[in-house]
Design a protein with these regions (language model features):
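Compositionally biased, low-complexity segments enriched in small residues
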Residues: 1-4, 12, 44, 74, ...
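N-terminal single-pass transmembrane signal-anchor helix
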Residues: 2-30
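Conserved hydrophobic/amphipathic alpha-helical signal-anchor segments
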Residues: 24, 30-74
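Extracellular/periplasmic head regions of type IV pilus-like filament subunits
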Residues: 54-123, 151
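Short, solvent-exposed loop/turn elements at domain surfaces
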Residues: 125-129
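Low-complexity, S/T/G/P-rich flexible repeat/linker segments used as non-globular hinges
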Residues: 130-151
Length: 151
């Protein structure tokens, strides 16, 4: 009797299925890791902006009227932040509406004694929640009550 060496179709299909499952699992894990990394960058960016805003306020007794991503935060004699960070790409993590999904959104209150800095996260990251979060001089919180001008 003549024996053939090799794999059967069933054995090949099982191996292909296992490879497909492992590939899918690694791709999902990779995407999840990337979202976490972008969220960590967002939280770090907001912390840096809050520190710069406080330094500005301590010297000028008012928060700046606006912040422009890519610009700087400075007064006539001091640079508090050389580059206002931009939201990491893709900017739509967290399913935030309008401008929040694109860049950080800053507004000063009418008196200049407070501000709102809205940023979005793609996933829950204790103590923050996925979606819109808002920083003020006193706290950072998850929110659905967004400041006016936020689309």
């Amino acid at each position: 009797m003549h024996q053939r060496k090799g794999f059967t179709i069933i054995e090949l299909l099982v191996v292909i299925a296992i490879i497909a499952i492992l590939t899918t699992m690694s791709a999902l894990s990779y995407n999840s890791t990337r979202v976490k990394a972008r969220d960590a960058q967002r939280v770090a960016d907001v912390g840096k902006m809050m520190a710069a805003l406080e330094a500005y306020y301590n010297k000028n007794n008012i928060y700046p009227a606006s912040l422009t991503t890519g610009g700087n935060l400075a007064d006539s004699s001091t640079v508090y932040m050389t580059v206002i960070p931009t939201n990491p790409s893709p900017k739509t993590d967290g399913g935030c509406p309008g401008t929040a999904g694109y860049d950080y959104f800053y507004t000063q209150d009418n008196s200049g004694s407070s501000y709102h800095l809205v940023f979005c996260l793609g996933r829950d990251s204790d103590p923050y929640k996925a979606g819109p979060n808002m920083a003020t001089p006193k706290y950072v919180t998850s929110t659905s009550a967004l400041p006016s001008g936020f689309n």
